Amino acid sequence: MKKPLAYRMRPKYLNDVIGQLDLVGPTGFLTNCLSQDSLVSIVLFGPPGTGKTTIAEALANSMNCWYKKLNAVSITKQEINDTIEECKKHESAIIIIDEIHRLPKDKQDLLLPNLEDGTFYLIGATTANPMLALNPAIRSRTHLLEVKHLTTDETIIGLKRAIISPDGLDNKRKYT
């Protein structure tokens, strides 16, 4: 059975991302990080369904470094500690935390020493206002980047891409 269309069409690298020009356009913040091979810790915030987690994974894939994706809702302290230990085995590592606003303060605090010493880069994704929802110590060590809804034109680009892509509909249907 095929996976859902949205899953199959999910961007794998930054240059696959549609829209978000402030982040991934020619002079976008993340594009500059990638071109300079210089990653920083970030928190992507914005409405649900805008691609925050997808952008996080696309950035990690584009940086060609080890990464682990965690969900703040279900993560345990042991999983955080195990992930940090795994990061220490890699020259460059990223921890992606989805729904980071749901990560309790004591678990956020576990990240701080290794975030400070460069053991890993943090990419958080949240629908909440990071100024209110995140530990000030985490906020001060990350760049806060807003992810916005796609414009109508950007949505049309995505639909056209899905229609012609072999991973999408592969031109098997006619649309008028």
Where are these regions (language model features)?
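Walker A/P-loop
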Residues: 2-3, 32-70, 85-86, 112-113, ...
